Amino acid sequence: MSNNGLDIQDKPPAPPMRNTSTMIGAGSKDAGTLNHGSKPLPPNPEEKKKKDRFYRSILPGDKTNKKKEKERPEISLPSDFEHTIHVGFDAVTGEFTGMPEQWARLLQTSNITKSEQKKNPQAVLDVLEFYNSKKTSNSQKYMSFTDKSAEDYNSSNALNVKAVSETPAVPPVSEDEDDDDDDATPPPVIAPRPEHTKSVYTRSVIEPLPVTPTRDVATSPISPTENNTTPPDALTRNTEKQKKKPKMSDEEILEKLRSIVSVGDPKKKYTRFEKIGQGASGTVYTAMDVATGQEVAIKQMNLQQQPKKELIINEILVMRENKNPNIVNYLDSYLVGDELWVVMEYLAGGSLTDVVTETCMDEGQIAAVCRECLQALEFLHSNQVIHRDIKSDNILLGMDGSVKLTDFGFCAQITPEQSKRSTMVGTPYWMAPEVVTRKAYGPKVDIWSLGIMAIEMIEGEPPYLNENPLRALYLIATNGTPELQNPEKLSAIFRDFLNRCLEMDVEKRGSAKELLQHQFLKIAKPLSSLTPLIAAAKEATKNNH
């Protein structure tokens, strides 16, 4: 009896649980239906040319016309076509002028107050364009790299601000009519958190870093004039297009892939296939390596359904060379018929999202997760890679408490949330203000996102999660460092760590290397302290479904 009593007394207490799950369904945020269609291009000049040739061939006249026609140079179709719209802000009335109807409808339902609009009209336009970008909604995520000589990039949609002295502001907002996927795209908007992350192996992680423009574009904020009798400022946007690179043919891509992937039948090397995710262009399985007994995740992608096949080649090549203990690493790849099989590490503990929404973490556990993530970020940043999607959904946990950033996102088509992307591009709760406002940015956008993720670990959700998506974007762009619900409950060194991560001034924001030396990380508990939380989160998740 005494032994039984001793056993009960020595049993560790259950991890603290959140009273209610803070996970919000992605479908709860309805910002209205977005129309991503664009105006049709002018008639193809080639058609008119063919008709003219036909009429000249049947009508009497000088036959030398044919000879002259052959000598005429071929005139190519219009390229880099832009449709320009004009948006201004009247400081007297507090109204935008010339705003597209679609934007006006979004703004009307955004819960951004009139006083907020008048206080920072430029931020309103920034977030409207960011939210409503048709390219953003269709963009795919792929691994990206920065130039060693330039940490920051100037967005191709940077702002030029000019004063208008006579009429209300009517500056151009460039709206690209060319939907070619190869064009440089603005920073993509991160989709809202789904109701439950079945498997973050179905997510893509690294997003494309837009190409540095050929010339610098001045970026400066606007503010309404203090004197209402003076004309409002002009809000000007310029779009610069990059030169298109020649596309690789499907056969060239297959030939290159054959030279990269392993030879052999993966069905003989791996066994016990179990499906854990299904998407538009592929399926994700767990499997067992016959030789080593290691459990792995295998992405099976139909190459015909991948929009940017050539980028997959670059990802495989780079991932083979970039291995790190804090990253879910690439292991192998195979061509099986029309499918590309990519083998990755598998972590059975699930995502950090389950832990932050179902349990309560203490500072020592939060410090341990932050340290592991910073080690991964220091590695990525030193290799000129910006992650740009740091959030709890993209942190995987092992049952031993190991913490790893998810893999380099081979194909966004695999994610099951694609149905929402056409009508709701989502709110980037973790995204740095400089990305939302399309300013120059570099690796420190990941540090901001890490700070937001630390707030997730404290409060169970990121700031502004329950705001209208457009207003959340506005608050990210204008509010600066988000406020904590109960900052007095945190230690001074934790508050300082958060302030270093969530510094609006990018120059003052800490780098991954600097923050690894922060005093807060010295209180980190062993990674094994996360195991009870992982087990408790798994149990709670099982009971919720």
UniProtKB/Swiss-Prot annotation:
**Residues in Protein kinase domain copies:** 270-521
Q: Where is the composition biased (Polar residues)?
A: 220-231
Q: Keywords on this record?
A: Acetylation, Allosteric enzyme, Apoptosis, ATP-binding, Cell junction, Cell membrane, Cell projection, Chromosome, Cytoplasm, Cytoskeleton, Disease variant, Epilepsy, Exocytosis, Intellectual disability, Kinase, Membrane, Nucleotide-binding, Nucleus, Phosphoprotein, Serine/threonine-protein kinase, Transferase
- Activity regulation: Activated by binding small G proteins. Binding of GTP-bound CDC42 or RAC1 to the autoregulatory region releases monomers from the autoinhibited dimer, and enables activation by phosphorylation of Thr-423. Phosphorylation of Thr-84 by OXSR1 inhibits activation.
**Region (Autoregulatory region) location:** 70-140
Q: Where is the composition biased (Basic and acidic residues)?
A: 68-77
Q: What is its main location?
A: cytoplasm
Phosphoserine modification sites are S21, S57, S115, S144, S149, S174, S199, S204, S220, S223
Q: What's the reported outcome of changing D393A?
A: Abolishes autophosphorylation at Thr-423
Q: EC number(s) for this protein?
A: 2.7.11.1
Question: Catalytic activity, per the record?
Answer: L-seryl-[protein] + ATP = O-phospho-L-seryl-[protein] + ADP + H(+); L-threonyl-[protein] + ATP = O-phospho-L-threonyl-[protein] + ADP + H(+)
* Amino acid composition bias (Acidic residues), ranges on this chain: 174-184
Catalytic site: D389 (proton acceptor)
Residue numbers of N-acetylserine PTMs: S2
Q: What is the effect of changing T423A?
A: Decreases CDC42-stimulated activity and autophosphorylation
Look at the named UniProt entry and state the broad enzyme category this protein falls under.
transferase
Its assembly, as annotated, is: Homodimer; homodimerization results in autoinhibition. Active as monomer. Interacts with GIT1. Component of cytoplasmic complexes, which also contains PXN, ARHGEF7 and GIT1. Interacts with NISCH. Interacts with DVL1; mediates the formation of a DVL1, MUSK and PAK1 ternary complex involved in AChR clustering. Binds to the caspase-cleaved p110 isoform of CDC2L1 and CDC2L2, p110C, but not the full-length proteins. Interacts with ARHGEF7. Interacts tightly with GTP-bound but not GDP-bound CDC42/P21 and RAC1. Interacts with SCRIB. Interacts with PDPK1. Interacts (via kinase domain) with RAF1.
The UniProt family comment states: Belongs to the protein kinase superfamily. STE Ser/Thr protein kinase family. STE20 subfamily.
Stated role: Protein kinase involved in intracellular signaling pathways downstream of integrins and receptor-type kinases that plays an important role in cytoskeleton dynamics, in cell adhesion, migration, proliferation, apoptosis, mitosis, and in vesicle-mediated transport processes. Can directly phosphorylate BAD and protects cells against apoptosis. Activated by interaction with CDC42 and RAC1. Functions as a GTPase effector that links the Rho-related GTPases CDC42 and RAC1 to the JNK MAP kinase pathway. Phosphorylates and activates MAP2K1, and thereby mediates activation of downstream MAP kinases.
Q: What is this protein called?
A: Serine/threonine-protein kinase PAK 1
Source species of the chain:
Homo sapiens (Human)
Q: Which gene encodes it?
A: PAK1
